[in-house]
A protein has these predicted regions:
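Class I S-adenosyl-L-methionine-dependent methyltransferase module
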Residues: 211-214
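Core catalytic lobe of class I
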Residues: 1-194, 201-203
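Conserved SAM-binding loop
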Residues: 206-207
């Protein structure tokens, strides 16, 4: 499958962006989320470092350390996505490997828009400040309109931040497409996208969501 992706991307600038299964026993529809650690690290290696292109991984911090050591690669930049949760884990990290994100490409609202200096900037057409590396974005709740049947769905705003700092002339490749949020972010931001998903149910969810964006 990934050889086909490589052929499709040949001659283009590809970057892998993915939120892989976390290997902590999530109840996915048709695949096991509890491999032994060696097999899991090898799986991540095969779809990142072995592809010989820059990549961006979203994971829990302690697992990103293990992946970086296994891949023998140090991230060029790490951001944190923080969210309210009733579980022990309340943030995930986004690690950029072999690519330097440009945070000036994503503008976020000013925190103090009533400040005199900020009002002047807005009047000058400066409608936001560059993205920080600490993102407070809520997880998707079961009652959210955005929610699908995928048990580990990423918020669209997170993925738009992750992708929006990458070079514009880029093919984004997600080897663990899930519900298709990476593809939707690419569509809204103007990036080309290739996604892979082995579960037919989740693939169809992603396909339907992407068709709605066309």
């Amino acid at each position: 499958m990934f050889r086909q992706v490589q052929k499709r991307c040949w001659g283009g600038a590809a970057i892998i962006v993915t939120d892989p299964p976390f290997n902590i026993g999530y109840h996915y529809n048709s695949y096991k989320d509890k491999l032994n650690e060696k097999d899991y690290l090898n799986l991540i290696y095969n779809v990142t470092e072995k592809m010989n292109v820059p990549y961006v991984l979203i994971h829990y911090p302690e697992d990103l350390y293990k992946i970086a050591i296994h891949n023998q690669k140090t991230p060029t930049r790490v951001c944190s996505w923080v969210y309210n949760s009733n579980t022990a884990k309340q943030h995930r990290d986004i690690a950029y490997f072999d690519i330097k994100p440009n945070f000036k490409q994503v503008l976020q609202p000013y925190k103090n828009p009533n400040d005199k200096r900020i009002k002047q900037r807005i009047a000058e057409g400066k409608l936001g400040c560059k993205l920080y590396d600490w993102w407070n974005i809520n997880q998707i709740k079961n009652v959210s309109k955005e929610k699908t049947e995928h048990p580990c769905q990423m918020p669209l705003d997170v993925m738009k931040n992750v992708i929006g700092v990458l070079p514009k002339e880029t093919i984004i490749v997600d080897p663990f497409m899930g519900s298709g949020t990476t593809g939707i972010a690419c569509k809204e931001l103007g990036y080309d996208f290739i996604g892979c998903e082995i579960d037919e149910k989740y693939f169809n969810i992603a396909k339907e969501r992407l068709f709605e964006e066309i």
